[in-house]
Curated annotation (Swiss-Prot):
Keyword match Transmembrane: no
CDD domains for this protein: SpoU-like_RlmB
GO molecular function, one term: RNA methyltransferase activity
Organism: Mycobacterium ulcerans (strain Agy99)
Alphabetized InterPro entries for the sequence: Alpha/beta_knot_MTases, Ribosomal_eL30-like_sf, rRNA_MeTrfase_TrmH, SpoU_MeTrfase, SpoU_subst-bd, tRNA_m1G_MTases_N
Lineage start: Bacteria, Bacillati, Actinomycetota, Actinomycetes, Mycobacteriales
PANTHER family, alphabetized: 23S RRNA (GUANOSINE-2'-O-)-METHYLTRANSFERASE RLMB
Name by which UniProt lists this protein: Uncharacterized tRNA/rRNA methyltransferase MUL_4155
Length: 310
């Protein structure tokens, strides 16, 4: 009868046809039970797509500083706390000799609800990569850069404006020293490019002796365009370069000014130099060819401050 496979004398063979493979009997399927559907490529750790996605996640966003910074030293830490810089933790070395600065830092941190952690000095050395910390370190979130328009507006509100822009300055110690000089000579702030420039890091904080806590630093996507915008609003753009055409003795510092500082090696870039109304230099009597960028900036700022006092 049709459909009746149990014919008398019939013998079921292990394969249906010659050459066909025999199935696993469901063993493989049962082995996959409970594992769910096959994950997509980017979710499988060893798949190239997953490796590319992981590398993209590790890559920092352009122009941003996403890591927590550590401010070292008693003066910088105290200046940050006095200025109310948001902080996540204060580390103090066990057994460190306290002075007024350390005592005030601990008191201010406690009043602000900042966790205070006492750690062995060796741990603090390791955490700060053996940089000079004087027994105290403050963790702060990434620096909150000002917008160039806001920086200029604040400077114009308290005339005459005095600003400094940095071109090709890659050493954070130079940035910190210039921020300190700007604060010392009555300047209003510092402008840096978003790329290929030093950032306000812990090293810059340390070199500024805490001045970075009260001196705004703005970051421009395009330095040349930002300087042109400032020039359109009445600010004189004065470049500072060893090959400048004008000595600082002949500089008129009475107008709103932004001093653009080039690096000691490269000087001012071509487009930035073309944007300047004039380029000044610091005359030197000795055989030294050029000054460190932060030293040269301090000399010019001191000259402008002298003129404005008289």
């Amino acid at each position: 009868m049709a459909g009746n496979s149990q014919r008398r004398g019939a013998i079921r063979k292990s394969g249906t046809k010659k050459g066909t493979s025999v199935g696993s009997g469901g063993q493989r399927r049962r082995g996959l039970e409970g594992r769910g559907p096959t994950p997509s490529a980017h979710m499988r750790p060893n798949h190239p797509a997953a490796k590319r996605a992981k590398a993209q996640q590790r890559r920092p966003a352009r122009g941003r500083t996403d890591e927590t910074e550590t401010v070292l030293g008693r003066n910088p830490v105290l200046e940050c706390l006095r200025a109310g810089v948001p902080s996540t933790a204060l580390y103090v070395a066990l057994g460190v000799e306290a002075d007024e600065r350390l005592t005030e830092s601990v008191s201010r941190a406690a009043d602000s609800g900042i966790p205070i952690l006492e750690v062995p000095r060796t741990d603090l050395d390791r955490m700060t990569a053996n940089h000079l910390h004087q027994g105290i370190a403050l963790q702060v979130p990434p620096y909150n850069y000002a917008h160039p328009d806001d920086l200029l507006a604040a400077a114009l509100d308290t005339p005459p404006a005095l600003l400094v822009a940095l071109d090709n300055i890659s050493d954070p110690r130079n940035l910190g020293a210039i921020v300190r000089s700007v604060a010392a000579f009555g300047g209003h702030g510092v402008l840096i490019p978003q790329r290929r420039s030093a950032s306000v890091t812990a090293v810059a904080w340390r070199t500024s002796a805490g001045a970075a806590a009260r001196m705004p630093v703005a970051r421009a996507t395009n330095l040349t365009r930002a300087l042109k915008d400032w020039a359109d609003r009445g600010v004189r753009v004065v470049g500072l370069d060893a090959g400048g055409d004008t000595a600082i003795d002949d500089l008129d510092g009475s107008d709103p000014i932004v001093v653009v500082v080039g690096s000691e090696g490269k000087g001012l870039s071509r487009l930035v130099r073309q944007t300047c109304d004039e380029v000044v230099s610091v005359p030197m009597a000795g055989p030294t060819e050029s000054l460190n960028a932060s030293v040269a900036a301090g000399v010019v700022l001191a000259e402008i401050a002298r003129q404005r006092r008289t």
